[in-house]
UniProtKB/Swiss-Prot annotation:
It is found in: Cytoplasm. Catalyzes the reversible interconversion of serine and glycine with tetrahydrofolate (THF) serving as the one-carbon carrier. This reaction serves as the major source of one-carbon groups required for the biosynthesis of purines, thymidylate, methionine, and other important biomolecules. Also exhibits THF-independent aldolase activity toward beta-hydroxyamino acids, producing glycine and aldehydes, via a retro-aldol mechanism. This is Serine hydroxymethyltransferase. It comes from Orientia tsutsugamushi (strain Boryong) (Rickettsia tsutsugamushi). Pathway: One-carbon metabolism; tetrahydrofolate interconversion; Amino-acid biosynthesis; glycine biosynthesis; glycine from L-serine: step 1/1. The gene is glyA. Belongs to the SHMT family. Homodimer. The modification N6-(pyridoxal phosphate)lysine is found at residue 220.
């Protein structure tokens, strides 16, 4: 490996080791997953499917893909699986290609309410090729408004209804979505990219009995390599999906990644993985309560999964400011648009916090109480400084200078805590 790349990898390893990772979509894979992903399987082209390849020399590749498929079907208790999508976005695009025609109507959650770009957002290909209609959360509870979903479905008669989100902290009633889809003759797609680990361990109800098709990423709560996944119990739809993935969307599958997926699925079938997901959820609840007790507005009043959404509109703090200054203190999170947010997506009015990565490191409730205090201390000080300068205006850089002692002290405490929980030993 060249020195330049080696040095950058070393720096990134140090960053991951010495900071608190609270981005809900990130996690730390096992060494076994990384070993497979860095294996000689990357050398092999394998266009096509098991026993139906367009290249020779795929006998062992077929076994790898077969193993991944068998394991994920067991994990999610389904009949059909495609493990070839390179990402969750491409998994969703394959579903659109398989089931829709350009101009068809799709019904999905609005981006500001917690939906995903690939669910018909205007900048995304899904919003350019299809007529996207969006439902929102309830303005008072910030929960899914099932009545609005049904009303819009009856009004617009979508070909596809999408359920599953990137910023929603409560449980989803897949059965209700199935009833709505059936009333209007729509396909139902469940995108469980964020909650796949909870579904696999039965801490969240499974969409498999209700949705025509289920997509997911293989990282996030599944703790595997970055990649995509498509599941179904419908044989005819699964055949359409296979054709949409290859040759419709992709050429050769990434066999080194599929091997890593197989390992991650095997790890998720182990009893300790269920214990891990339970701890992820406990940690999220503890963090949400701590921040609530410190006066911060947690959307929906709490969480049922691995994430929480902190609405900072009442504190006169932007998501951009919170993300930047928490990062300066060694706490990594992401700014997040809030429901009915009027600020730019590059500014936002809140932050999203997730517990999977730090739980993988071994953090439990006590550690997350400590983390919550660090976060609240930083945010409290931002609010104080901005309040004192409210008539003059103040930049993030100026806030950072004023917070220098608090940031320095917090960063030191963060590093001490992280040193007690190494990501990888040896």
């Amino acid at each position: 490996m060249c020195k330049e790349i080696y040095d950058l990898i070393a720096k990134e390893l140090y960053r991951q080791q010495s900071t608190i990772e609270l981005i809900a979509s990130e996690n730390f894979t096992s060494k076994a997953v990384m070993l497979a992903q860095g294996s000689i399987l990357t050398n092999k082209y394998a266009e096509g499917y098991i026993n139906k390849r367009y290249y020779g020399g795929c006998e062992f590749i077929d076994e790898v893909e077969s193993m991944a498929i068998d394991r994920v079907k067991k994990l999610f208790k389904c009949n059909y699986a495609n493990v070839q999508p390179h990402s969750g976005s491409q998994a969703n695009q394959a579903v659109f290609l398989a089931l829709l025609k350009p101009g068809d109507t799709i019904l999905a959650m609005d981006l500001n309410s917690g939906g995903h770009l690939t669910h018909g957002a205007k900048p995304n290909i899904s919003g350019k090729f299809f007529n996207a209609v969006h439902y929102c959360v309830n303005k008072d509870s910030y929960l899914i408004d099932y009545n609005e979903v049904e009303m819009l479905a009856q009004q617009h008669k979508p070909k596809l209804i999408i359920v599953g989100y990137s910023a929603y902290s409560r449980k989803i009633n897949f059965a209700t979505f199935k009833e709505i889809a059936d009333k209007v003759g729509a396909y139902l797609l469940a995108d469980i990219a964020h909650i796949a680990g909870l579904v696999a361990t039965e801490y969240h109800s499974s969409p498999i009995p209700y949705a025509h098709i289920v997509t997911s990423t293989t990282h996030k709560t599944l703790r595997g390599p970055r990649g995509g996944l498509i599941l179904s119990n419908d044989e005819s739809i699964s055949k359409k999906i296979n054709s949409a993935v290859f040759p419709g969307m992709q050429g050769g599958p990434l066999m080194h990644v599929i091997a890593a997926k197989a390992i991650a699925f095997s790890e998720a079938l182990m009893p300790q993985y269920k214990e891990y997901i339970n701890q992820v959820m406990l940690n999220a609840k503890v963090l949400a309560k701590l921040l609530q007790d410190r006066g911060y507005n947690i959307l929906t009043g709490g969480t049922d999964n691995h994430m929480l959404l902190v609405d900072l509109r009442g504190k006169n703090i932007t998501g951009q400011e919170a993300e930047y200054l928490l990062d300066a203190a060694g706490i990594t999170c992401n700014k997040q648009v809030m429901p009915f947010d009027t600020t730019s997506p590059t500014i936002t009015s809140g932050i999203r916090l997730g517990t999977p990565a730090c739980t993988t490191r071994g953090f439990k409730e006590n550690e997350f109480i400590t983390v919550g205090k660090y976060i609240a201390d930083i945010l409290d000080n931002i609010a104080i400084i901005k309040s004192a300068k409210k008539n003059e205006g103040i930049t993030i850089t100026e806030i950072e200078k004023s917070l220098n002692s608090v940031i320095t002290r917090t960063k030191h405490h963060v590093q001490e805590l992280c040193n007690c929980f190494p990501i990888y030993t040896n």
